[in-house]
């Protein structure tokens, strides 16, 4: 049997990444050019800065990924690319590069939803068992997804306002922590106690929706009022209280989803899946079903996860033509108009 190699491109936000996947789940390379240092002084991602950085490094990422994998363009079977959701300028850089490379090398083009990539990152460590439930937690999304079979995604719950990763970064900015703040908040939380008892929005309601704007506002008010009065703030307790509220909400909604859908596996993915507090709570509280979380290197944005999702689309011959465009607000159940089904 001839080996299959997929080159994947990810540029939806502030990471430029190109990866090579061999067959179903073997990542031969996963080159990531991070822009975190460039965005730190702004306290968040600046879209124009992100796009310019993608342009500067993407060609080098292609070269490095092929070299690290030990293959050439002639060995490839397809090119995959994130076409949404994300920052439109950033997406267009990756799309242009992927389409040009695919066209020049006479390779089929596979469009991949960025969030499907996060979900399928777990395929690298073990085969996924269907049907499954996925909790996707990142800087831009918080979603519960029911996946009855590979490539078939149904959103059953999502945030009504802030994504959980966004809330982490916003409260981190209030405390003067370095962007991105999630890791530092997690570390501080392990040293503190839940003394502030922040609200857990909609935690007892029957639906599977999330809300973090009220929690964020409550945190900011506590911090602001203490500063105004000159009261002492214990950062460890602030972080522990914030994280306890976040995790209570995530766990409560995930448990409800598992009780309502016939899942054989729970996948937790996205940048916030790197949070040690979340991993600990999942291990303690969800024991009746297998929980799969991608390795830390695959939790953030990377092309490896895009390649892993693309392998499923390749099997279905879900290719796109060269009119494929960026979809910054792409939904999970939305497919490109340019699909060419062979």
Swiss-Prot record:
Documented EC number(s): 2.3.1.234
Gene3D superfamilies: 3.30.420.40
A single GO molecular function term of this UniProt record: N(6)-L-threonylcarbamoyladenine synthase activity
Role according to the record: Required for the formation of a threonylcarbamoyl group on adenosine at position 37 (t(6)A37) in tRNAs that read codons beginning with adenine. Is involved in the transfer of the threonylcarbamoyl moiety of threonylcarbamoyl-AMP (TC-AMP) to the N6 group of A37, together with TsaE and TsaB. TsaD likely plays a direct catalytic role in this reaction.
Predominant localisation class: cytoplasm
UniProt-annotated binding residues for Fe cation: 114, 118, 301
Necessary cofactors: Fe(2+)
One GO CC term, this protein: cytoplasm
Keywords for the protein's UniProt record, in alphabetical order: Acyltransferase, Cytoplasm, Iron, Metal-binding, Transferase, tRNA processing
Record text on cofactor binding: Binds 1 Fe(2+) ion per subunit.
Name of a matching Pfam family: TsaD
Compartment annotation: Cytoplasm
Top enzyme class: transferase
Domain of life according to the entry: Bacteria
A biological process term (GO) from this entry: tRNA threonylcarbamoyladenosine modification
Protein name: tRNA N6-adenosine threonylcarbamoyltransferase
Record-linked InterPro entries: ATPase_NBD, Gcp-like_dom, KAE1/TsaD, TsaD
Similarity field: Belongs to the KAE1 / TsaD family.
Reaction equations catalysed: L-threonylcarbamoyladenylate + adenosine(37) in tRNA = N(6)-L-threonylcarbamoyladenosine(37) in tRNA + AMP + H(+)
